[in-house]
Amino acid sequence: MKNKLLTAALLAAVLAGCNSQEKKKEENKDKADVVSAPNNQQVDLPAPYATKSVKKYSKVIGWTGEEKPTAPAGFTVSMFADKFVSPRNIYIAPNGDVFIAESNTETKGVKKVKNQLSGKSQSQPSGESANRITILRDANHDGKPELQKIFLSGLNQPFGMLILNNYFYVGNTDGLWRYPYKTGETMIAGKGEKIVNLPAGGYNNHWTRQLLASPDGSKIYISVGSGSNDGEHGMDNEIRRANVLVVDPNGKNEKIYASGLRNPAGITWAPDKKTLWAAVNERDNLGDNLVPDY
């Protein structure tokens, strides 16, 4: 019975992928191959989905023995710390403490089977998320932390981290939390408070919530990915998504700082501290030779 169920799930996954590709191709068959560009320039582009999208995932093999990643001339690579469960983001505190958010996408059912078929499951973890933050401290600066312990646990897919005004902020997928914090603490003991609710229902593949303080510390910027690949689940599911939001440190006065950003997973300040940079993962599976516009 178990084998029959697995076979059925595999077949369903394959058919779903094929049907999705054909549906998108049919929906876009009447769209023009030529689009208008600034200054009335004409740019020849293929129609969306004119070619089948192909993916090839990497296989994680880790380090063995004395092996190390190859570095450019003049650089070396060494292991700082290990034994993490999906270390997804790094935050370095003003005092030099290093915080690691351990979290990952959680998949189950047909989606999990599709990941196994495509090879995606071998390139990234997809089981239960660790949902914790680990602290590392290298007090003597020898490149090896003397302290490595769980700093905060029981979270919900944490990603962004920030220390501001005696608080430790965490960007969980469903909200911005803050905890009382004193410099040098190695564990959060106080009770936190959720100061901003963030959308996380339905399609939530873009679950990371990066945090960034304004240079003067008066604002906190929060990146929130879209609730879809390209709006296929309806615009009601995109409310407050595909944005960089900005709030006061107490979570009040929320505004949209930037919008139309499919998945702004990384945000930081340019060297001038006046321009916000965002690294955005744009839409997938359009086919060859097309810009990935969202």
Each language-model region and where it sits:
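Bacterial signal peptide processing site
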Residues: 19-21
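Beta-propeller domains with acidic blade repeats across secreted/periplasmic ectodomains
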Residues: 25-294
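Sec-dependent signal peptide recognition
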Residues: 2-8
